[in-house]
Design a protein with these regions (language model features):
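Short, low-complexity N-terminal intrinsically disordered segments enriched in polar/charged residues
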Residues: 1-39
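A beta-strand edge to alpha-helix "cap/lid" segment located at domain peripheries
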Residues: 73-84, 88-172
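Generic N-terminal initiation segments characterized by hydrophobic and/or small/turn-forming residues
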Residues: 6, 11, 62-65, 97, ...
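Aromatic-acidic/polar surface patches that form glycan- and anion
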Residues: 10, 14, 26, 57, ...
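A solvent-exposed, acidic/Ser-Thr-rich amphipathic alpha-helical stretch
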Residues: 32-106
């Protein structure tokens, strides 16, 4: 296989990884999200991950996915769109930058899925993921998110976390 063919396969695998991550979050398929990561991962999402540990230290991917669940499960619906993939593929490293636009919604009335300004927080930014090939699959070993801006009701993250915690307690 030529290096160009190999690079195309890697690019396709990285895009699939981003797509699986977004789909997993939006459908709350946490095993799909977990499959996107190596067992140990460096996470730096700025303020969004600050409470989960030092971004310079690796953490267990299982713990990171549990943290995502503790927020996302409290939203009625999310939509993560990841686009404009830019690849860096060399003999020693594989990474990909991509734009993010993510809507996070708590409906005032779930029977009428109309979103008012106070029902949504949109986060716009850029991922920079670094990958390792593990058992023939490309997995995220380092993920950075730089938030460029957000629009909407930022308090929804607090409300979603409280709702997710209440859901967890009611299941016990």
């Amino acid at each position: 296989m030529s290096s160009m063919e190999k690079n195309v396969l890697i690019r396709n695998a990285l895009i699939a990884n981003y797509n699986n991550y977004a789909q997993g979050i939006d459908t709350k398929d946490w095993s799909m999200v977990r499959d996107c990561f190596a067992d140990d991962v460096f996470i730096d999402y700025g303020a969004l991950s600050a409470s989960t540990g030092d971004p310079a230290l690796p953490r267990e991917a299982d713990d990171w996915v549990k943290h995502l669940q503790s927020v996302i499960n409290g939203f009625d619906i999310t939509q993560h769109m990841i686009t404009n993939h830019r690849f860096c593929i060399s003999s020693t490293a594989v990474s990909c930058r991509a734009y993010l636009s993510a809507d996070h919604v708590i409906f005032a009335n779930t029977e009428v899925p109309v979103v008012a300004d106070e029902d949504v927080i949109t986060v716009v930014g850029e991922y920079n993921n670094h990958y390792s090939e593990i058992d023939g699959e490309w997995k995220i070993c380092k993920s950075e998110l730089v938030v460029h801006w957000s629009h909407g009701n930022a308090e929804l993250f607090v409300e979603a976390t409280e709702r997710a915690l209440a859901q967890l307690k009611s299941q016990k």
